[in-house]
Amino acid sequence: YIIGVQANIWGEYIQTPEYFEYMAFPRLLAMSEVQWTQPEHKDFESFARRLDKEFERLDYCGVNACRNFYEVNQAGAWNKSQQTYEVTLNTFCPDADIYYAVNDSTVNTSSSLYETPIPLDEDATVYSAVYRSGKPLGKVTRKSFAVNKATGCDYTCNPEAGWEHLNKGFGLTDGRRGYARDMRRWISFYQDTVQIVVELKKPQKVKEVAFSSLWRPVNEIWPAR
């Protein structure tokens, strides 16, 4: 058995030395922090502030480190009290500002400064970036959100979903599209026929109903038809 900490990299997926460095750093710095810092002295904010200097060292040594630390995390959710869909932005990077734009890939200090959740009333793509002292620290991140008349609504399935990992009970109306690489966004049914009833918030006209389905034969997942 292993006493202490352990970090694994699955070599069969690593094709170049540069990709190995990308997968290893700054994760090895975090592992060292966990192992060598006494519990009473562990402080994530302190570690995050010290990463700036560590990235300078890695750059000087020519290490191809992953810089996701300087990117924006985007999350969307239905605000029941405000009855609106909101996108929240955050970053692990301390003492930094987040600038964003909706449906505009150009993000700079002239863009909107993020201070409160961003309300959306229709399909939109949010672009965002981290800045400090007017200088960009990372890449522009983007995420698309599906906002429509069903977003945030309750629904029932007959029969019930067989598998639903995230936002149970709202996986179909949470404003997030499913992607092949992220199984958590999908819900599954094992039966041939499914009835889904969406409770719209008020009487309104519906012109079109659309949905996505996943096809992954290796996992015995077949598209709806």
Q: For each of these PLM feature ranges, what is it?
A:
Residues 1-98, 104, 148-161, 168:
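Substrate-binding groove of N-acetylhexosamine-processing glycoside hydrolases
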Residues 91-97, 203-206, 224:
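Short proline/glycine-enriched turn/loop motifs at strand-loop junctions of beta-rich domains
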